[in-house]
């Protein structure tokens, strides 16, 4: 018996995201006259038909293939920080110039944010499965030939685009499954695992194997070639035709434009939250080694090991706290994790001891771990179901740009002020994303996000409620 189309596509929506908002004037009824900016949206399903990661061999294959893809994405992002001092030394360049290896992928992530839905529409999920690894291969291949430095930022545009479209697509797919908090915890834990072993392998190759920095990318070439085969095989039947047929059957031809999704303030709030979060995470991961060498004055191997412990803490946090977050409620849990992260960041900054620094960095990674998965779950609970693929895809890819933008900013400032600027910079970013999180609709009790959608709460309502209470109490005190 042939598998239903919904099983082939793998995009469903949570039960609490079924109720649709009033019809948007941007909706277009006639599919033949829609423009390229308009994107297919996933069908509306009830909670009983939510996909499970293990409901079929197809889903099992696809889920574990995305896990492997996230491991490679983590290795790519994590290793660059460990190799940064050696790239700087090899090319004899400044902090600002070497930081361009962080900035250039931002353009790739931005393009991924804008094109994610069009790729789904014209090529389906199999298009993502092919383009993601292929773009990473195009970006990595020149690195093994250690070309002149100006070529590095250019080729890394491709890795940014490949990571961006996979990041957005697989987040949207897994984020709409049953037990999304836990599954996204494993998915992003895989990224953390890659970011843990990537620097470890790279550091060992350079410091213990006496190899030049570019030899690490021979390893990545082989691993990404495997990813191309795995993902293409896993999503081979998830074509554009399947994607469009599922949509037309479920919605009668209605489509939601990208412009409409971007007019919703929640989309931008989550995108800014992820931009700041990923920026803080990768700034720490990218500059810890240099910070330990220049400020804590430790040996190269131990400096490389410190970033491994940071990513290890992040990996464990994503997996372990993923089971806690859903039980506490996303709004409360992430608020607690962020406050603890701020405390760890301050201690990491102010305690000038190597062992203490590694300990605080590890716990900082642990509490930062579940933030990205929780933001994806929040999107599925606060936004209409037909916004999910577009909004999550945009927020994830736009947020991924933080991995390029903010580490570059740290490097540019460090050129004149020293790498010590890493700590106050990351502290400011953590406070910023905490404020962004508190601006989301919904209270801090469990189920607050769901009730916020049911009650039609708006962005910043929590701050307004607190302001009214403070004002009322001050008036009462005066009386």
Model-derived features: positions:
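Extracytoplasmic gate region of multi-pass secondary transporters
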Residues: 80-81, 264-316
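C-terminal transmembrane helical hairpin of 12-TM major facilitator-type secondary transporters
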Residues: 328-375
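Helix-loop-helix hairpin linking two adjacent transmembrane segments in secondary transporters
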Residues: 180, 186-242
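Cytosolic juxtamembrane N-terminal segment immediately preceding the first transmembrane helix
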Residues: 2-69, 73, 256-260
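Conserved MFS/SLC helix-loop-helix module at the cytosolic interface between two early adjacent transmembrane helices
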Residues: 111-150
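Helix-breaking motifs and short loop linkers at transmembrane-helix boundaries and internal kinks
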Residues: 92, 124, 145-150, 297, ...
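Helix-to-loop junctions at the C-terminal end of transmembrane segments
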Residues: 112-125, 317-330, 414
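Intracellular juxtamembrane helix-capping segments at the cytosolic ends
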Residues: 164-178, 370-384
């Amino acid at each position: 018996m042939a598998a239903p189309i919904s099983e082939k596509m793998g995009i469903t929506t949570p039960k609490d995201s079924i109720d649709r908002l009033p019809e948007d004037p941007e909706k277009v009824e006639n599919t033949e006259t829609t423009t390229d900016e308009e994107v297919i949206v996933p069908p509306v399903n009830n909670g009983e038909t939510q996909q499970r990661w293990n409901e079929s061999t197809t889903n099992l294959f696809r889920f574990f293939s995305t896990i492997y893809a996230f491991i490679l994405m983590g290795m790519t992002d994590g290793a660059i920080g460990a190799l940064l001092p050696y790239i700087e030394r090899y090319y004899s360049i400044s902090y600002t110039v070497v930081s361009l290896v962080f900035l250039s992928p931002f353009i790739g992530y931005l393009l991924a944010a804008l094109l994610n839905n069009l790729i789904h529409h014209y090529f389906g999920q199999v298009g993502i499965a092919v383009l993601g690894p292929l773009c990473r291969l195009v970006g990595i291949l020149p690195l093994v030939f250690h070309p002149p430095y100006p070529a590095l930022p250019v080729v890394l545009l491709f890795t940014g685009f490949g990571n961006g479209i996979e990041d957005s697509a697989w987040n949207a797919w897994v984020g709409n499954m049953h037990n999304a908090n836990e599954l996204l915890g494993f998915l992003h834990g895989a990224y953390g695992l890659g970011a843990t072993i990537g620097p470890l392998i790279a550091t060992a190759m350079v410091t213990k194997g006496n190899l030049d920095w570019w030899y690490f990318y021979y390893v990545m070439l082989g691993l990404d070639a495997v990813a191309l085969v795995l993902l293409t095989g896993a999503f081979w039947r998830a074509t554009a035709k399947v994607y469009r047929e599922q949509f037309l059957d479920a919605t009668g031809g209605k489509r939601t434009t990208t412009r409409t999704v971007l007019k919703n303030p929640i989309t931008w709030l989550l995108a800014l939250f992820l931009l700041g979060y990923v920026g803080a995470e990768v700034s720490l991961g990218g500059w810890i080694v240099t910070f330990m060498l220049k400020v804590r004055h430790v040996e190269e191997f131990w400096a490389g090991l410190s970033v491994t412990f940071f990513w290890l803490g992040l990996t464990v946090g994503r997996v372990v706290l993923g089971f806690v977050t859903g039980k506490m409620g996303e709004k409360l849990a992430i608020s607690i994790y962020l406050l603890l992260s701020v405390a760890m960041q301050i201690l990491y900054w102010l305690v000038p001891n190597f062992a203490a620094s590694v300990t605080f960095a590890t716990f900082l990674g642990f509490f930062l771990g579940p933030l990205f998965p929780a933001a994806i779950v929040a999107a599925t609970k606060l936004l209409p179901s037909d916004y999910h693929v577009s909004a999550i895809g945009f927020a994830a890819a736009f947020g991924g740009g933080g991995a390029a933008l903010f580490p570059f900013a740290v490097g540019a400032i460090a050129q004149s002020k020293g790498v010590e600027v890493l700590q106050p910079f990351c502290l400011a970013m953590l406070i910023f994303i905490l404020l962004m999180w508190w601006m989301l609709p919904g209270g801090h009790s469990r189920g607050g996000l769901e009730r916020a959608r049911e009650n039609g709460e708006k962005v910043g309502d929590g701050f307004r409620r607190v302001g009214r209470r403070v004002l009322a109490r001050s008036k009462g005190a005066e009386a």
